[in-house]
Amino acid sequence: MKAFVWTLSVLLFLLGSGHCKGGQLKIKKITQRRYPRATDGKEEAKKCSYTFLVPEQKITGPICVNTKGQDAGTIKDMITRMDLENLKDVLSRQKREIDVLQLVVDVDGNIVNEVKLLRKESRNMNSRVTQLYMQLLHEIIRKRDNSLELSQLENKILNVTTEMLKMATRYRELEVKYASLTDLVNNQSVTITVLEEQCLRMFSRQDPHASPPLVQVVPRHSPNSHQYTPGLLGGNEIQRDPGYPRDVMPPPDLPTAPTKSPFKIPAVTFINEGPFKDCQQAKEAGHSASGIYMIKPENSNGLMQLWCENSLDPGGWTVIQKRTDGSVNFFRNWENYKKGFGNIDGEYWLGLDNIYKLSNQDNYKLMIELEDWSEKKVYAEYSSFRLEPESDYYRLRLGTYQGNAGDSMMWHNGKQFTTLDRDKDTYTGNCAHFHKGGWWYNACAHSNLNGVWYRGGHYRSKHQDGIFWAEYRGGSYSLRAVQMMIKPID
């Protein structure tokens, strides 16, 4: 198309040149007619000339030259030097472009090879990633299976522990029945003896001879196989009434024949859910009944069973010590006091190690409830409570006091725990030996809640070894019931 335009421009140029020459002839004739007087020299000088400016066309395509019927002069007139220069420039530029394209093609070839290598490496990498992903997936599945097995094992252990506690509770109920039946048989034996003496007085009319001491037909205390730890120091005879001889029953009044069962089995609530970190968390979870709960402190891997007291408003108290009837001997060694002993639904000591773990997982306060033999209850509460570790012999840390029982515990604040076989008090002797229990003795005690349980209040003893609170009833009065409880500070 460009060649056609260029050819058309050349034709127009040629036509314009011919037309100009013809016009000059016509003008010449006209001027000769108008100015006949002019000389030939002047006329020749007055001839007009016309120059047509045709825009120069750049040749961008091939040039076709037809030499037939044209001579060299005509071709020379048709193709100018500038056109040739332009053609040379075009050819040079195209050559440079071809060289550049050749370089690009070479570079593209290298890039293509690199792309192929990268694609191959990418496929290998994808295969490796897939393999690693499958391995990771298998590992996750295996760990999940192990976690599931561990959870199932923990549930089995929890269920077995629950069954053991149920069996222990049933055994405790049987013990209560056994003790009641034992008392009944012993009372009947005493009654029979008294009746025999009366019969002898009536029918023989002779003075009765002094009868031997009455012994129990059935032992009052059966072995406590469900206690926390064995190994009493001194035996169960320490827990006795001070006024009665050992192994002798007091002569009672003549009883009437019982028509109902003489004993009442205490109702024990056992909570299967948990474990909880303390009784407050169990109460917040909706368990408002007092009973045996499964507890697992945050800084411990072991489980423990203890009594949660919710009858005191607002509830959530964790019981760490309880005295009610003297059925458990508290005159024990260090190992017993460390691990704990007793019956969860009766008298027990939770254990120094367990108390340490509980009191150090949060900020706790302590409340001690005391009951005398007239059934009057008082309390002493301390704003903070915790124990130091065993390396410091479970040193006691207490806060400020409030309550109506008087402060008999601050005397023991900051003191280490003492037992018969580990003396850590400030007295020259062993306070545990004199007070018959384990406690945070100073020199020696203003309170002795792990002492001997005496019946009736005031007792006779060489040493003040009863359960006493000096600021309430004094050191010669043994309290009827005591329980120590802790709870997180509000």
Curated annotation (Swiss-Prot):
Record keywords, A-Z: Coiled coil, Disulfide bond, Glycoprotein, Secreted, Signal
Q: Where is the Fibrinogen C-terminal domain?
A: 270-490
**Cell membrane keyword on record:** no
BP term (GO), one: blood coagulation
Disulfide pairs here are 279-308, 431-444
Q: Which NCBIfam families match?
A: GGGWT_bact (NF040941)
What name does the UniProt record give this protein?
Angiopoietin-related protein 1
The species is: Mus musculus
